[in-house]
């Protein structure tokens, strides 16, 4: 697992979590949704005009697809497929969320080009109610900003779940803790996240995701949204069932930084380089994130969090 990081103990901790899962039957992963959004905004003189515009544009998805497919405008992406749109009227402004699939690329440049072309060549030309202003991104698209909307519903990136059932033996021997201690920490951590208004319900998802992103040429500006996470852990017969849900994982196996020699080499090592491999890579990222969650939580769950303290004291270095 390629990890680019400067945190002492991160790699060995992640691998410890992976070892515990492997000895318990391994991870299971699922890709639930795949969308990337660009949220344009159209400003009117009145709320009534914004509502009328909303009612006109909502049924236009199929005509928009046909227009994009047949439009000879240079620079349009044929890989960005418009799947749906959604409107939100706020006063005299109508926000229009274009939702695309973008194949094996993250696709923000693709959907920027296509959304701009739609706004200029289709919407402004055909809308029965003309807006005063059109803005390509009205800040509802979720790009590089964690938000409650995309944490709850997904829809900006891939929604991926990883799960495993840890055996009592693996928890005791590999993780050096107990099922009861892990379950108790999960309870405490969930309530702590809620009480603090945290965007995620998890322990340390950004750590694994950032390390993987840097190693494999992903856009590190998307670590924040990609590491929104909802973890669960509960006791089952003879073990502990653990999951992590990443509702906005933005990853690619083609384009951008993935073409750099070192990044491409690491993606190739994971059998994730090139077209047709992005879902595999997304599932590996989710599994790696869960592996670190398991190990770090195990260290924190010991009496007085002694193992967590020792790991950071011994591997973090003295200052």
What kind of region is each of these model predictions?
Residues 39-41, 93-95, 132-135, 221, ...:
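Structural motif
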Residues 101-259:
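Glycine-rich anion/phosphate-binding loop at the beta-strand->alpha-helix junction
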Residues 274-319:
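Extended hydrophobic packing segments that form well-structured cores
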Residues 57, 61, 108-115, 198, ...:
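Generic structural signal for well-ordered, non-membrane alpha-helical segments
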Residues 210-213, 267, 286, 298:
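Generic hydrophobic alpha-helical scaffold/packing signal
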Residues 16-65, 145-187, 231-286:
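A structural-propensity feature for long, helix-poor, extended segments
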Residues 1-101, 116-123, 215, 226-234, ...:
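Generic N-terminal targeting/processing segments that precede catalytic cores or assembly contacts
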């Amino acid at each position: 697992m390629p990890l680019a990081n400067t945190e002492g103990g991160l790699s060995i901790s992640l691998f410890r979590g992976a070892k515990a899962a492997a000895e318990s039957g391994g991870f299971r992963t699922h890709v639930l949704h795949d969308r990337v959004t660009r949220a344009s905004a159209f400003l009117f003189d009145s709320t009534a005009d914004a509502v009328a515009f909303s009612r006109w544009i909502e049924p236009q998805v199929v005509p928009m697809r046909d227009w994009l497919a047949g439009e000879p405008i240079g620079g349009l992406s044929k890989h960005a497929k418009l799947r749906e749109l959604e409107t939100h009227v706020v006063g005299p402004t109508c926000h229009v969320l274009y939702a695309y699939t973008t194949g094996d690329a993250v696709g923000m440049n693709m959907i920027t080009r296509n959304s701009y072309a739609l706004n200029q060549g289709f919407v402004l030309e055909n809308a029965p109610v003309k807006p005063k202003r059109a803005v390509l991104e009205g800040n509802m698209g979720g790009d590089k900003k964690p938000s409650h909307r995309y944490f709850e519903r997904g829809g900006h990136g891939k929604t991926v779940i990883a799960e495993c059932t840890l055996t009592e033996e693996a928890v005791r021997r590999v993780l050096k803790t107990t099922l009861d201690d892990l379950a108790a920490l999960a309870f405490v951590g969930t309530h702590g996240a809620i009480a603090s208004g945290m965007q995620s319900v998890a322990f340390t998802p950004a750590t694994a995701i950032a390390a993987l992103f840097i190693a494999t040429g992903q856009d590190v500006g998307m670590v924040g949204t990609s590491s929104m996470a909802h973890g669960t852990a509960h006791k089952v017969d003879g073990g502990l069932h653990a999951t992590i849900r990443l509702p906005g994982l933005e990853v690619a196996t083609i384009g951008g930084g993935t073409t750099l020699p070192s990044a491409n080499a690491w993606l190739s090592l994971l059998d994730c380089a090139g077209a047709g491999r992005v879902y595999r890579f997304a599932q590996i990222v989710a599994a790696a994130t869960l592996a670190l969650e398991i190990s770090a939580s195990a260290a924190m769950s010991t009496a007085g969090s002694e193992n967590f303290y020792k790991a950071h004291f011994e591997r973090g270095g003295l200052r």
